């Protein structure tokens, strides 16, 4: 699906106007405002499956990684893990640089996302990155930081998103496997999700001011490692569909490989995933460019 430039910019502007609390501001001394929203398709797409890995292949303006593209009301859990990469800031740019790493349910083809992860943030003009733990039930609320979990480069993280069919509640848990500290949060009242996709993703979040599409520069994270092969966290990255656990890359054409590119100039690659491990659970995502 192609999203016209003016429509995309208008959508992001409306989101900012209606969802960012007026008491929030972005300065070099505060944490960033960002939205880890649904996947934004690029202005052009490959049209054939990736015959090398046996999965479907797409370009995205904000996501890089792997996703399961399922059907509504079938997913009850998504599990992911990663090693927090050290970010290199690039001073002299006219906006901040951000990179988010997360596991979630929904957002691939729906307008909701239930997710938790970590974030690296380089304030405009700074050469030093700050790191945060966060969760989000989009679009019910902007991403919320959790100070209980301190994020350091090299730490291993595990995220779990689960749905309780009895209470109709989503629960997100993020655990620093290196320190043992974790948090758990449930969705706000009235929130509902489609439960139609699951993802392990490196993202360029929305919230930036310099680009017409509203995205930040993608911070240089080098390489981020996802999955059990790197973290030893069991069943990561995986999705539970109709009660059965599947490796996220084991579902053939239902598995989407996502390469992040500049929305307006899709030949500019920002980040791309590696092929999947033998067990289809693990992969790396490699930073390629700031994007603009």
Question: What residues fall within each predicted segment?
Answer:
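Exposed, interaction-prone regions of secreted/extracellular proteins
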Residues: 24-292
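Secretory targeting signatures
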Residues: 1-27
């Amino acid at each position: 699906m192609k999203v016209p430039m003016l429509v995309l910019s208008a959508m992001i502007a409306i989101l900012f106007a209606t969802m960012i609390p007026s008491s929030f501001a972005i300065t070099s001394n505060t944490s960033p405002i960002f939205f880890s929203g649904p996947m934004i398709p690029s202005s052009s797409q490959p049209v054939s499956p990736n015959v090398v890995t046996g999965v479907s292949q797409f370009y995205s303006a904000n996501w890089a990684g792997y996703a399961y593209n399922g059907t509504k009301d079938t997913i009850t859990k998504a599990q992911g893990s990663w090693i927090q990469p050290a970010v290199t800031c690039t001073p002299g740019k006219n906006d901040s640089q951000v990179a988010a790493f997360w596991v979630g349910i929904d957002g691939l083809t729906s307008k909701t996302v239930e997710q938790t992860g970590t974030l690296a943030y380089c304030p405009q003009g700074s050469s030093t990155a700050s790191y945060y733990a966060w969760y989000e039930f989009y679009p019910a609320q902007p991403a919320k930081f959790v100070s209980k979990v301190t994020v350091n480069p090299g730490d291993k993280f595990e995220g779990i998103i689960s749905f309780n069919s009895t209470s109709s509640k989503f629960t997100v848990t993020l655990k620093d496997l290196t320190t043992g500290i974790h948090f758990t949060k449930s969705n706000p009242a009235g929130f509902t999700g489609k439960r139609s996709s699951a993802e392990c993703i490196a993202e360029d979040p929305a919230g930036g001011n310099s680009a017409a599409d509203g995205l930040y520069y993608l911070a240089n994270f080098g390489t981020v490692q996802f999955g059990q092969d790197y973290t030893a966290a069991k069943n990561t990255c995986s999705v539970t569909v109709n009660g059965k656990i599947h490796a996220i890359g084991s579902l053939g054409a239902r598995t989407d490989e996502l390469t992040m590119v500049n929305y307006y100039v899709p030949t500019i690659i920002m980040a791309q995933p590696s092929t999947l491990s033998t067990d289809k659970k693990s992969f790396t995502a490699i930073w390629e460019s700031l994007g603009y």
